[in-house]
């Protein structure tokens, strides 16, 4: 079974979020995800596949995708390159059960894949049962969701990669809408909106942002090398 097939099965079986409110959450029915999905699909550009004189497949416009601001997301949306993008992030996280929900919700919410995965690296190093105890609350799971902010989630919810990824990426979407750029959005994710907009961002948060952005830069470079090895623009 391919990763893409498992992704479809995973999504079909997701009836999870908001468990404590009574009704099951079905992601396909979420109006926010539906609107986002309609918006981003209209922007898709096709990867061009050609055959050279020796019968080798080449991808002459693959570098156009890699030069874009969110190359991994753009290539995830292309049928030709999608499976290889999935393979890359499954290898990165070490688990389909971790990578596939992040890919799914980042796509639906139009969030950069490299930003999303870098955030999870910074928060939990891709450990779905990671726990951090604060003085008055607990952070849990992949996106380290806070027990005070997400009071409606059960302990099982926090440690469920699908549930955690949805809530973490929805909160990141909010942070991106409030911040001036991705760096400020990460600061809001870590320290909260009030402290950041008041100019009271803690030094620890600034280090946190630098660490995640540094990891992301390395991730982008590695991803680009991987894609070029899988989809050569020309045959050397």
Give the location of each predicted region.
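N-terminal secretory targeting signals
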Residues: 1-89, 220-236
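Catalytic glycan-binding domains that act on GlcNAc-containing polysaccharides
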Residues: 61-236
């Amino acid at each position: 079974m391919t990763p893409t097939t498992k992704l479809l099965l995973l999504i079909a079986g997701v009836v999870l979020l908001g468990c404590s409110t009574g009704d099951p959450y079905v992601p396909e029915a979420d109006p926010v995800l539906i609107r986002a999905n309609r918006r981003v699909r209209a922007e898709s550009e096709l990867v061009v596949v050609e055959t050279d004189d020796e019968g080798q497949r080449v991808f002459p416009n693959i570098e156009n995708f890699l030069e874009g601001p969110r190359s991994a997301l753009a290539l995830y949306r292309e049928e030709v390159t999608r499976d290889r993008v999935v393979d890359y992030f499954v290898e990165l996280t070490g688990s389909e059960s971790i990578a596939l929900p992040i890919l799914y919700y980042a796509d639906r919410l139009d969030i950069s894949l490299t930003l999303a995965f870098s955030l999870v690296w910074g928060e939990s190093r891709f450990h779905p049962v990671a726990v951090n105890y604060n003085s008055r609350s607990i952070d849990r799971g992949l996106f380290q969701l806070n027990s005070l902010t997400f009071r409606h989630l059960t302990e099982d919810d926090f440690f469920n990669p699908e549930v955690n990824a949805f809530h973490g990426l929805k909160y990141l979407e909010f942070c991106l809408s409030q911040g001036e750029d991705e760096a400020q959005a990460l600061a809001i994710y870590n320290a909260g909106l009030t402290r950041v907009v008041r100019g009271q961002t803690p030094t620890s948060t600034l280090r946190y942002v630098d660490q995640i952005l540094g990891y992301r830069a390395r991730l982008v470079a590695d991803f680009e090398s991987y894609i070029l090895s899988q989809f050569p623009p020309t045959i050397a």
